[in-house]
């Protein structure tokens, strides 16, 4: 089977590696173009790009697939199927119609719940008890195509964005293999648009004084490692935390261990990181402060 693989971040690498390990005929890899990264703004290739080059697979990095030139190039690979995993570009109808078995997508949520760009973060933010992977046939809508296979699992108390990302990536790779092995027998299941909800891209990682404590706690988990508070114009990331219910406040730091009183409870940071410094245990962090943050309020 001739496969075009389309993906960019680390989430997609597991699926590509599995296809290569099984000696599938990956005829081309489509990924986002290298972009400036780091302090020196050096052009950096996507994780998928790096894996493909090491395997001597042709890499394509178009800015768009809407032109007839790009569509003809795609068709010239004569793909039986295109596998899509966090690619980052919209696939027009002309591309969707080229592969014999269409374009199938690995989506890290239980569709139709959490269609869109940030399903893992929104799964945690909403307090969902379970999540999973959906292998779906792409259509012109936003993650609205029929489902080919789906598998779910319970979310553990210790899970955060990183742990779910890794679990879903591994599960997605395994589920993809089952779909490809049964590609001619698949019976697509239409999604219910009435049950759909959407996971917009997250742009704001701040924990606010007005947040309910449980929401703040979920933000720490969902936005790992980017959730932060601001105190006296200092930006402090919270990488791990617990919370205790029943007390209530408006963003006051109530003791020397930097416990934060919020609506419905107290957020208890465990691991934090000041801008420009390494992550550290909360006890080491407060020990290194020049002045206590007790009685101060987060912004």
UniProtKB/Swiss-Prot annotation:
Source organism superkingdom: Bacteria
UniProt-listed Enzyme Commission number(s): 2.1.2.9
Record's keyword annotation contains Protein biosynthesis: yes
Catalysed transformations (reactions): L-methionyl-tRNA(fMet) + (6R)-10-formyltetrahydrofolate = N-formyl-L-methionyl-tRNA(fMet) + (6S)-5,6,7,8-tetrahydrofolate + H(+)
Single GO MF descriptor: methionyl-tRNA formyltransferase activity
Recorded GO CC terms: cytosol
Keywords recorded for this protein, A-Z: Protein biosynthesis, Transferase
Entry binding sites for (6S)-5,6,7,8-tetrahydrofolate: 109-112
UniProt entry tagged with the keyword Cytoplasm: no
Principal EC category: transferase
HAMAP family: Formyl_trans
Family (UniProt): Belongs to the Fmt family.
Purpose of the protein: Attaches a formyl group to the free amino group of methionyl-tRNA(fMet). The formyl group appears to play a dual role in the initiator identity of N-formylmethionyl-tRNA by promoting its recognition by IF2 and preventing the misappropriation of this tRNA by the elongation apparatus.
Protein name: Methionyl-tRNA formyltransferase
Classification of source organism: Bacteria, Pseudomonadati, Pseudomonadota, Alphaproteobacteria, Rickettsiales
